[in-house]
Amino acid sequence: YMIVIPAKNRAFNIKCDDGDSMKLETLQKLVGGPIEPVHTLLEPGWAREKDVDGILLLVNEEGRLKGLPENPRAEEMVSYAAPAHAKLVGPAIVAAGRGEEIIGFAKPVAETICAEWL
């Protein structure tokens, strides 16, 4: 599962459509354009998976250019060490990073992250 954080509505879990990941086309459809990974404040241990390097937000790379609405809940998850991403806009997807892979979470893990962070 991955977690979708819309700019205006409640966050929700979505089942991965490609094994433990999602197809690029699905991710792009969910954020409304090309995806850009942004590191979050969450430690890799939140994923409860082996070899996870970090927890990521996937956002629309062109979101600011398109004038998408700000997403304050997504902003709260972002490391303040990355000032270029201080204002996140549009929908965001929470996923785990494992090397070059972007993977989802087990359902209970996604539910815990939603409950604790969103």
PLM-predicted stretches and their roles:
Residues 1-118:
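Short beta-rich binding modules
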